[in-house]
């Protein structure tokens, strides 16, 4: 394990479209701690494709968390986070959660199902996930090649790997991260980390996320302290990664009274549509391509599976 004087290492799973979101996350982490910190984006890592496309990554970084021990030199411990997050408390609180003999620490429970699943773009049920993890890199001998080979050999499938961590014994998994450190589409006075997990309504691509004001406020602080320039924001918009109306939200959103907010959001959504903006276009194109690859695979194999599904 790392000593007290060593940096807290936070590895962030992302693709190119989320790099600015990583910067916003990093800013929020640093703003709430004076600990030594390293935030390492994981973008376009060399990850082999499983033979069965049904076992392929759902995003460009789904398997990135399993690359962390090797990236860390199999030394010390590390935190994994997704890019679509914002932190409101000292990261040391998460860092100091004990492993209690386990190799990883993941989320304990999923709260507020009854309200967050009613939100536009939300799933019907939220599952326990590993979007925030503590990893003891010294005790995890993972290589992404061997993990993908396990799927190719039919030992497990994507869901078993990602959601059940089937490559670990149950004793190696500590369910010690409270919901407040992976608060799915929910924020209150106890929230430590807000996770904008619903792709359809992330505040940089959708006008109307009920907790988008937190993200906009962080961006305003970055513009004020010089860690972000207006030209950086405009570049992401020009590339199609962020919605055109985001600039209006950043500039004026905090000045809009509550009773006018819905109209403001509807206006922004209309403006984005008129501008031809398609949220997460590359993600949805990749999803379609994955569907085609699965169909071709099933036709070629007669419906048999090389990945245990």
Task: Please place each PLM-identified region on the residue numbering.
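Active-site-proximal specificity loops/subdomain of glycosyltransferases
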Residues: 37-71
